[in-house]
Regions:
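Cleft-lining beta-strand/loop regions that shape enzyme active-site pockets
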Residues: 1-5, 9-123, 127-130
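Short linear motifs in exposed loops
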Residues: 141, 154-156
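Short, acidic, Ser/Thr-enriched surface-loop or helix-capping motifs
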Residues: 147
Length: 193
């Protein structure tokens, strides 16, 4: 059984999509049968980046949408005709925020991965920064985002499918262990079918 762990630690930035696609392609060439994607402590990043990554994993269809206070809706949909069909687990925690929650929420809505860990942060808003003439800037909210099934994450977060606490004094990563056990169980079932 060959499963691998992929960490997206820092944030979803402009280069993350190509790095992700390249890593997934390399792992598939190696014959992986399961994948753990670790977005614990990932504060988020660029909405388009996470949408492009999800487009590579999910079937064609709605990935995420944003809605302004006035009701204007913008949809991000999958269209690249690529879908990753291996058992997956996504690790999250209370420091998984914003784009990380979009990722986890979409994977959960499409039932593409088991979400494992603790409740995510709950930052379901899109913000922008406007520079001021004195050199300072103002950051303000322009929209809320929603998962494909319309889940509003703001102030609530994403609830994992399997809640697994990771105590500060833990000597092993029990969340990662739970993900590997989940994948081993999924692969045993598919091998028996």
């Amino acid at each position: 059984r060959r499963q691998r762990q992929m960490c997206i630690r820092d944030r979803f930035d402009d280069v993350t999509t190509e790095q992700f696609k390249s890593a997934v392609d390399d792992l598939q060439k190696q014959g992986i049968t399961g994948l753990v994607i670790d977005i614990r402590n990932n504060p988020g990043g660029v909405l388009k980046t996470v949408a492009d990554m999800l487009d590579y994993i999910l079937p064609n269809g709605l990935i995420v949408y944003t809605e302004t206070k006035s009701g204007k809706r913008q949809e991000y949909s999958g269209s690249d005709n690529h879908e990753l069909n291996i058992p997956m687990a996504v690790l999250v925690n209370g420091n998984s925020a914003s784009a990380s929650e979009i990722f986890a929420g979409a994977m959960q809505d499409y039932d593409k991965a088991q979400i494992i860990g603790t409740q995510t942060f709950g930052k379901g808003i899109v913000q922008t920064i406007r520079p001021l003439t004195d050199g300072s800037a103002v950051k303000y909210t322009i929209a809320k985002y929603f998962t494909p099934k319309g889940q509003d994450i703001h102030g609530k977060g994403v609830t994992p499918d399997s809640i697994v606490e990771l105590p500060d004094d833990a000597t092993e990563d029990v969340q990662l262990k739970a993900a590997v056990e989940y994948l081993n169980g999924k692969m045993s079932v598919s091998a028996a079918e």
